[in-house]
Amino acid sequence: MKAEQQQSIPPGSATFPSQMPRPPPSTEQGITTESELAKKAQITPNDVLALPGITQGFLCSPSANIYNIEFTKFQIRDLDTEQVLFEIAKPENDQENDESPQESARYVRYRFAPNFLKLKTVGATVEFKVGDIPIHHFRMIERHFFKDRLLKCFDFEFGFCIPNSRNNCEHIYEFPQLSQQLMDDMINNPNETRSDSFYFVDNKLVMHNKADYSYDA
Protein backbone atom coordinates (compact mmCIF):
# COMPACT_ATOMS: atom_id res chain seq x y z
CA MET A 1 0.00 0.00 0.00
CA LYS A 2 1.53 3.29 -1.09
CA ALA A 3 1.55 6.26 1.24
CA GLU A 4 -0.41 9.22 -0.06
CA GLN A 5 1.91 11.85 -1.47
CA GLN A 6 1.43 15.27 0.09
CA GLN A 7 1.06 18.09 -2.41
CA SER A 8 3.60 20.86 -2.17
CA ILE A 9 2.21 24.36 -1.70
CA PRO A 10 3.77 27.12 -3.83
CA PRO A 11 5.27 29.98 -1.82
CA GLY A 12 3.06 33.01 -1.25
CA SER A 13 3.75 36.61 -2.15
CA ALA A 14 3.08 40.03 -0.65
CA THR A 15 2.60 43.54 -2.03
CA PHE A 16 2.10 46.91 -0.36
CA PRO A 17 -0.68 48.77 -2.22
CA SER A 18 -0.60 52.55 -2.03
CA GLN A 19 -4.32 52.72 -1.22
CA MET A 20 -6.24 50.61 1.26
CA PRO A 21 -9.74 49.43 0.30
CA ARG A 22 -12.50 50.51 2.66
CA PRO A 23 -14.89 47.65 3.47
CA PRO A 24 -18.51 48.52 4.30
CA PRO A 25 -18.96 49.52 7.94
CA SER A 26 -20.55 47.01 10.30
CA THR A 27 -23.93 48.17 11.52
CA GLU A 28 -24.87 45.70 14.26
CA GLN A 29 -26.69 47.33 17.16
CA GLY A 30 -25.46 47.23 20.74
CA ILE A 31 -21.85 46.44 19.82
CA THR A 32 -18.80 48.67 19.98
CA THR A 33 -18.35 50.64 16.76
CA GLU A 34 -15.17 51.86 15.12
CA SER A 35 -16.32 55.47 15.35
CA GLU A 36 -16.80 55.10 19.10
CA LEU A 37 -13.28 53.76 19.55
CA ALA A 38 -11.82 56.58 17.46
CA LYS A 39 -12.94 59.03 20.16
CA LYS A 40 -11.22 57.17 23.00
CA ALA A 41 -7.89 58.34 24.41
CA GLN A 42 -6.85 54.73 25.05
CA ILE A 43 -8.03 51.61 23.24
CA THR A 44 -7.83 48.30 25.10
CA PRO A 45 -7.91 44.64 24.03
CA ASN A 46 -11.53 44.34 25.18
CA ASP A 47 -12.43 47.26 22.92
CA VAL A 48 -11.19 45.62 19.72
CA LEU A 49 -12.59 42.22 20.69
CA ALA A 50 -16.04 43.84 20.83
CA LEU A 51 -15.89 45.11 17.24
CA PRO A 52 -18.45 43.35 15.01
CA GLY A 53 -16.31 43.29 11.87
CA ILE A 54 -13.15 44.35 10.09
CA THR A 55 -12.16 47.98 10.57
CA GLN A 56 -12.44 50.54 7.77
CA GLY A 57 -9.38 52.50 8.87
CA PHE A 58 -6.64 52.49 11.47
CA LEU A 59 -7.48 52.89 15.16
CA CYS A 60 -4.18 54.58 16.02
CA SER A 61 -1.58 56.65 14.19
CA PRO A 62 2.04 55.58 13.64
CA SER A 63 3.03 58.10 16.33
CA ALA A 64 1.34 55.89 18.96
CA ASN A 65 4.29 53.51 18.61
CA ILE A 66 6.43 55.34 21.18
CA TYR A 67 8.38 52.12 21.76
CA ASN A 68 9.77 52.15 18.21
CA ILE A 69 8.67 48.57 17.62
CA GLU A 70 9.70 47.59 14.11
CA PHE A 71 9.08 44.24 12.45
CA THR A 72 12.01 43.27 10.25
CA LYS A 73 11.29 39.67 9.19
CA PHE A 74 8.27 37.41 8.82
CA GLN A 75 8.12 33.74 7.85
CA ILE A 76 5.27 31.24 7.59
CA ARG A 77 5.90 27.48 7.54
CA ASP A 78 3.68 24.42 7.41
CA LEU A 79 4.32 22.57 10.67
CA ASP A 80 3.33 19.21 9.16
CA THR A 81 5.85 19.32 6.30
CA GLU A 82 8.31 22.01 7.50
CA GLN A 83 7.85 23.70 4.11
CA VAL A 84 8.40 27.47 4.14
CA LEU A 85 5.29 28.98 2.60
CA PHE A 86 6.17 32.65 2.77
CA GLU A 87 9.12 34.79 3.85
CA ILE A 88 9.78 38.50 3.73
CA ALA A 89 12.50 40.60 5.33
CA LYS A 90 13.21 44.29 5.45
CA PRO A 91 16.40 45.10 3.47
CA GLU A 92 19.39 45.77 5.69
CA ASN A 93 20.00 49.20 4.15
CA ASP A 94 16.46 50.25 5.15
CA GLN A 95 16.69 49.19 8.78
CA GLU A 96 18.43 52.37 9.87
CA ASN A 97 15.79 54.58 8.29
CA ASP A 98 14.04 56.40 11.14
CA GLU A 99 11.17 57.86 9.11
CA SER A 100 7.74 57.25 10.57
CA PRO A 101 5.79 54.69 8.53
CA GLN A 102 3.04 56.00 6.29
CA GLU A 103 -0.45 54.49 6.32
CA SER A 104 0.28 52.39 3.21
CA ALA A 105 3.26 50.76 4.95
CA ARG A 106 0.89 49.31 7.53
CA TYR A 107 -1.28 47.56 4.96
CA VAL A 108 -0.10 44.46 3.09
CA ARG A 109 -1.75 42.27 0.45
CA TYR A 110 -0.93 38.55 0.46
CA ARG A 111 -1.47 36.04 -2.32
CA PHE A 112 -1.41 32.28 -1.73
CA ALA A 113 -2.32 29.12 -3.63
CA PRO A 114 -5.82 27.66 -3.13
CA ASN A 115 -4.55 24.67 -1.12
CA PHE A 116 -3.20 27.06 1.52
CA LEU A 117 -6.76 27.06 2.87
CA LYS A 118 -6.50 23.34 3.66
CA LEU A 119 -3.57 23.74 6.04
CA LYS A 120 -4.21 22.80 9.65
CA THR A 121 -1.32 24.35 11.58
CA VAL A 122 1.35 26.85 10.58
CA GLY A 123 4.16 28.51 12.45
CA ALA A 124 4.60 32.25 12.00
CA THR A 125 8.04 33.51 12.99
CA VAL A 126 8.50 37.24 13.45
CA GLU A 127 11.68 39.18 14.08
CA PHE A 128 11.40 42.67 15.51
CA LYS A 129 13.45 45.30 17.26
CA VAL A 130 12.51 47.82 19.93
CA GLY A 131 13.79 51.24 20.96
CA ASP A 132 15.03 52.79 24.19
CA ILE A 133 11.97 52.02 26.35
CA PRO A 134 11.51 48.57 27.94
CA ILE A 135 8.29 46.85 26.87
CA HIS A 136 6.10 45.02 29.37
CA HIS A 137 3.07 42.93 28.48
CA PHE A 138 3.43 43.10 24.68
CA ARG A 139 0.37 41.46 23.14
CA MET A 140 -1.10 40.96 19.68
CA ILE A 141 -4.74 40.31 18.81
CA GLU A 142 -5.32 39.34 15.18
CA ARG A 143 -8.85 38.99 13.80
CA HIS A 144 -9.53 37.38 10.41
CA PHE A 145 -12.76 37.95 8.49
CA PHE A 146 -14.20 36.83 5.18
CA LYS A 147 -16.54 39.66 4.24
CA ASP A 148 -18.57 40.11 7.46
CA ARG A 149 -17.87 36.64 8.90
CA LEU A 150 -15.30 36.18 11.67
CA LEU A 151 -13.10 33.22 10.71
CA LYS A 152 -10.67 33.19 13.62
CA CYS A 153 -9.27 35.39 16.36
CA PHE A 154 -5.67 34.82 17.45
CA ASP A 155 -4.31 36.19 20.72
CA PHE A 156 -0.55 36.03 21.41
CA GLU A 157 1.79 37.33 24.09
CA PHE A 158 5.31 38.45 23.13
CA GLY A 159 6.41 38.91 26.74
CA PHE A 160 8.99 41.37 28.04
CA CYS A 161 11.44 43.08 25.65
CA ILE A 162 14.57 44.78 26.92
CA PRO A 163 15.49 48.19 25.44
CA ASN A 164 17.34 48.33 22.11
CA SER A 165 16.95 44.59 21.58
CA ARG A 166 16.28 42.45 18.54
CA ASN A 167 13.79 39.69 19.26
CA ASN A 168 12.21 36.75 17.49
CA CYS A 169 9.46 34.32 18.34
CA GLU A 170 7.23 31.79 16.61
CA HIS A 171 3.49 31.76 17.12
CA ILE A 172 1.45 28.69 16.23
CA TYR A 173 -1.66 29.30 14.16
CA GLU A 174 -4.28 26.56 14.27
CA PHE A 175 -6.51 27.24 11.30
CA PRO A 176 -10.26 26.60 11.49
CA GLN A 177 -11.74 23.83 9.37
CA LEU A 178 -13.51 25.45 6.43
CA SER A 179 -16.30 23.98 4.36
CA GLN A 180 -15.62 23.42 0.68
CA GLN A 181 -18.25 26.03 -0.18
CA LEU A 182 -16.58 28.63 2.03
CA MET A 183 -13.15 27.85 0.58
CA ASP A 184 -14.57 28.21 -2.93
CA ASP A 185 -16.09 31.57 -1.96
CA MET A 186 -12.77 32.78 -0.55
CA ILE A 187 -10.92 31.67 -3.69
CA ASN A 188 -13.48 33.30 -5.99
CA ASN A 189 -13.50 36.57 -4.02
CA PRO A 190 -9.85 37.69 -3.84
CA ASN A 191 -8.95 40.27 -1.20
CA GLU A 192 -12.32 39.85 0.55
CA THR A 193 -10.53 37.91 3.30
CA ARG A 194 -9.07 40.53 5.63
CA SER A 195 -7.34 40.83 8.97
CA ASP A 196 -6.73 43.43 11.64
CA SER A 197 -3.57 43.04 13.75
CA PHE A 198 -3.71 45.04 16.97
CA TYR A 199 -0.60 45.42 19.14
CA PHE A 200 -0.83 46.43 22.79
CA VAL A 201 1.66 47.40 25.47
CA ASP A 202 0.26 47.38 29.01
CA ASN A 203 -3.24 47.00 27.51
CA LYS A 204 -2.94 50.17 25.39
CA LEU A 205 -3.11 50.04 21.60
CA VAL A 206 0.21 51.18 20.12
CA MET A 207 0.15 49.66 16.60
CA HIS A 208 -2.52 48.63 14.12
CA ASN A 209 -1.69 46.80 10.88
CA LYS A 210 -4.07 45.49 8.24
CA ALA A 211 -3.91 42.87 5.50
CA ASP A 212 -6.04 41.23 2.86
CA TYR A 213 -5.62 37.87 1.20
CA SER A 214 -6.29 36.10 -2.07
CA TYR A 215 -6.02 32.37 -2.71
CA ASP A 216 -5.79 32.21 -6.49
CA ALA A 217 -2.02 32.06 -7.09
Swiss-Prot record:
Tetradecanoate binds at residue 110. The keyword Zinc does not apply. Gene3D superfamilies: GMP phosphodiesterase, delta subunit. GO terms for biological process: cilium assembly; lipoprotein transport; nervous system development. GO terms for molecular function: lipid binding. The keyword Oxidoreductase does not apply. Residues 1-31 are annotated as: Disordered. It comes from the Eukaryota. Residues 1-18 have a biased composition (Polar residues). GO terms for cellular component: cilium. Keywords: Cilium biogenesis/degradation, Developmental protein, Lipid-binding, Protein transport, Transport. Myristoyl-binding protein that acts as a cargo adapter: specifically binds the myristoyl moiety of a subset of N-terminally myristoylated proteins and is required for their localization. Plays a key role in ciliary membrane localization of proteins. Required for the establishment or function of the nervous system. Adopts an immunoglobulin-like beta-sandwich fold forming a hydrophobic cavity that capture N-terminally myristoylated target peptides. Phe residues within the hydrophobic beta sandwich are required for myristate binding. Belongs to the PDE6D/unc-119 family. This is Protein unc-119. It comes from Caenorhabditis briggsae. The gene is unc-119.
